[in-house]
Structures are given as structure tokens and as C-alpha cells.
Amino acid sequence: VFHIAGETPCDEPLILSSRPIFDMPKDFLAGTLPEYDVVVIGSGLAGMTSANILGRAGHRVLLLEQHYKLGGLATWFKRPGSHTFDISLHGFPYGMIKSCKRYWNDAITSNIVQLKNIRFDNPMFSLMTTYNREDFTKLLTSQFGVSEETVVRFFDTARGMNFYDDQSMTTRELFEKFFPGREDIVRLLMEPITYANGSTLEDPAITYGIVFSNFMAKGVFIYEGGTDDLVTKMQAELTKNGVDTRIRCDVSKILVGPKGVRGVVVNGKEIRCKAVISNSNLRSTIFQMVGPEHFDAKFVEDAQEVRLNNSSTQVYMAMKPEVEIPESTGDLLFCSTAPAFRTDLLLDRNITSRTFSFYYPRTRPHGKQRHAIVSSTNANWSDWADLNEEEYEASKQDLIETTLDALEKYVPNCRDKIELVEAATPRTFHHYTKHLAGASFGTKFEGLAVSRSLPQQIHGLYHAGSVGIIMSGWLGAINYGVIVSNEVDQMLCRSMSSPSPAIQAQ
């Protein structure tokens, strides 16, 4: 097996072909139509959801993915020994059940189950929780000594937040209003959300309130069966609804004419369309695929000010066949040796805080009964981008060793119990997704307004990706895909008296 130097190897062995060298390479666009109603660029959850809704409504939809499989960051890789690792299957709110039922199918919805053992361990406190409003209310009143009235007001305030609220209050100010001087409570409330979407105490409070309240509704959920099963079922649903899905198809240009979007260039081939939904990075959509010359000067200025969110590192650990991890270890473990919650410490290359995701056999009940652990940390692109190969490999090995050191507290003698370990860095995320700076959470809050205003700049151009923190994560991505697909349907059906009946029914 050969792999790209410095990167986590992909799950496709690169084998010398037995075909004659004069064979033509496969045409991944063979059989495509010359024109579609909609081209969706990128098959992350937002892209796939948009494509599925529009295909179900009867529109001609072409879904283009540059990678060799669908899913975006909702992905996985396999290793010998029946090991399958999920990249980002680490918990989402209950709302995912409702969204999948309405916009996908019951086969997907029925596999969503709750994680009931969310564990915190740091110098300030150590506890286990079901991570919902009822349990957090008990914790805040009994263990942290906050009055029930204050807790109720805090939860009600967070739950009542929406995009149209005052955006000047920061998350830090929100916490100080209800829990002044309580860094331990800030840590309890903020640390998991920072891991979930890269948000900080300096971001607008509404970005925290909306995401936190989604989780507090009924807790943390996961897809039982693994990301590979989820994406396989989504791909089958896309096919059922007439979506033309193509992998290994890299869009280099979105074509713009006097009246708006007119097509895309993919693998060197021009395909016409009436609308484009980009599920790619917002900045690369604007500045690379379209080009700044097609936008108003003020819009370009605003787009240039959009900050990318941080990246991530992960360490994947497969246990030996005979090893079992007690379920009392937890499903998600937020552990830290840092004395207090600090965003910069969560990003620092000298890692003090990690999330361990424990995968028990029930995660993939139909596969071999194997245990696995994935460690995730937030990371800065700058700490990895400019390392030479020797430095890069040494830094990856250090990441692995320090992760095993941290795991030892929770899984004693872990090195003897693990048969395979690999690491991914911001460079890995960049390599496989093409996200600028390896961003694993899209953009900061200001990216949402820029993303939403694309159709006002260029008729037929839309974006449905991870932006503004609110639209990050599995649920945020799916819901943004829903919002954008409805707008595209309305645009396509403007000459009709009403939107497509299938969309209207949703």
C-alpha cells in the first residue's frame, strides 16, 4: 500500500494496474446530461440534503464530489482487522431525528440513538451526565450551588435566542450575566460546544445559545451503524429520487453570464445549469470557483473579512480483539489537565484538553465485535502547515504518544491493549476535503451573512456549507441544506404559481 507522504493513508490501496498503459482513464462524467436544473458542488451533509430534497421535488440534479466517496467530513476509513473509524460521528442533538425523518427516510431515522454517558474530568470537577436540561439543572443547583431561578432564566434565555437577536453580546458576557466569576460553570457549559463547532467566548452569544439549547432539549445522539451505513443509505435515497451522483469530479469553475449562473467546469468539461449550490468552503467558492470580479466591491470586502474557523487533530486507536472497554468509561469523555477553560489552550499544540469518543460494539452492531477510541482536539493550521516532512512525522508521532499518555488514566495499560493507532492533522483534513487551512468547522459568525447573500450578488448562486457556527455540525449542515434547497426550488419555479408540490408538502 502506498500513500501520500505525511498523510493518514486512505482506505484504497494504490496498486499497479494490470491494464495496458494505453487504456484511457475512467470518465467519471460519462452519461451526464448537457444541462441540469441544479448542480450541487460537494457531498457533505448540506450538499446531499439539498440534492435529495430538490431531486425528490422533480428537478434535474447533478451532485459532484471531488473525493472518492460521499459524505464530506461525515466520513470513515477502514483498516485491516475489521476496523472502521468514523471521522466526525461524535454526537448531535435530537433535532437530527426530526430532520432525517422529514428530509431523508425512516431507515436512517430509526438508527439514531442516545448517548447517555457524557463524562467530564478536569482539575475543577469530575462528573457524568446525560447532557440534557433536566440533568444540567440538577448539576448546577446541587453540585455547583446555583439557585434554580437563575438556572431556569439562563436556559430560557439561551433557548429563546435566534439569528435576528442582538448580536453584540458575546458568550463570555452571557455567562457573566448569569454566573459571574464562575469559571467552573463556564467550563461545564462551554467546553463541549467548543469541541462541537470551534466557538469561543468572544463569539456572539446567539451562536452559543442556539447550539447549546439544541443539545439541552433531549441530550446527545449518535448514528448506530456507523457513518458508512448512514452515507450508504443516503446515497440509495439520492438514487431513488433521481439525483445524478458523481464522485472524483472536481469543479474548477462556476460559470457566470450576464443573467447569472450558467454552468460549471468539472474535470475540464462544461455542464450547463440554472442554479449552483456550493457545499464547498465559502471563501474558495467566492474567490476561486467564481472569482471576485463577478461581485460588488462591498461584498468582496465583506467576504475577505470572513474568518475561517479552526482545524482539528485526531488519533484513531483500535483495540485488540480480546480487549473490552467497560461502558462505565463513558461514551464521550471531555478530559483536561488545564487549570481553567481557555480557548487558546484548547487550540495549543501543547495539548492539555481532549475529547475521547469510545466506540463499543453496539456502534456497529452488525459488524465484528470490536472496540475503538478516537481522540479529537481543536488545532491551529499554523502549527502544522509549514513543517518539513521530518518535522511533520515527528509531530504526528508526538501527538500519538501524548494522546496515549492521556488515555492511560482512563484505559490502564492502553498501549498493550491497542493493535493499531494512526493520527490525522490539519494537513490531513486539508488534503482530503480541500477546506482552506484545513478548517473543520467552516467559518466564524460573519460567514453566515455572506453565505446567505450570494443569490443577491449572482442570480442562481447559493451556498450551503458550514458557516457562522450555527450551521456547523451534522444537524446545522442538514438544516442549512433544507433552507437553501427551498430557496432554490422557489427560484426555479418562479414562473409557476407555487413551489414544487413535494417541497411545499415539506
Which role fits each region the language model picked out?
Residues 22-146:
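N-terminal glycine-rich phosphate/pyrophosphate-binding loop and immediately adjacent elements
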Residues 10-19, 252-367:
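Mid-domain catalytic core of redox enzymes
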Residues 466-488:
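A conserved FAD-binding loop/helix module that cradles the flavin
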Residues 212-262:
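Helical element adjacent to the flavin cofactor pocket in flavoenzyme catalytic cores
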Residues 321-427:
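C-terminal segments that line or cap access tunnels to active or ligand-binding sites in enzymes
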Residues 187-196, 412-471:
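A glycine-rich dinucleotide-binding beta-alpha-beta segment and adjacent secondary-structure elements
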Residues 1-38, 56-57, 448, 499-506:
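Extreme N-terminal leader/targeting segments of oxidoreductases
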Residues 123-205:
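Rossmann-like flavin
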